[in-house]
Amino acid sequence: MDKHLLVMKWDYKYDKESTWFDEDSGEEQYELKEGASYTLPHIREISLEIRSVKTEGDLIHAEIYVDHNTYTVCNNGESVVAFAYDDYMVAGDFVSQSLCMKFTVTQK
């Protein structure tokens, strides 16, 4: 069986009381392995979990879990968009982080 990867293109935003703002973007590739768990870029408190991987002929379905939400990603479908958020206080300042992710499945 061919190996497949879960590809995640991501955009990150960080805002501290509207006084300091930062952005970043990138792409990660993860082995499409049922039960695997990966740390997200920038927001390390939230992980990406691959709950199940099913093959039906040439079609690959992956069920993933990110920040309290479950998504299904297929190798012949459109990108699946997911979001992760983390808000907290630092020395009395409110900090907001967000990660917009677009997932696809591709052959290795």
Annotate each language-model stretch with its function:
Residues 1-108:
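Surface-exposed, beta-sheet-biased, low-hydrophobicity segments with strongly acidic/polar composition
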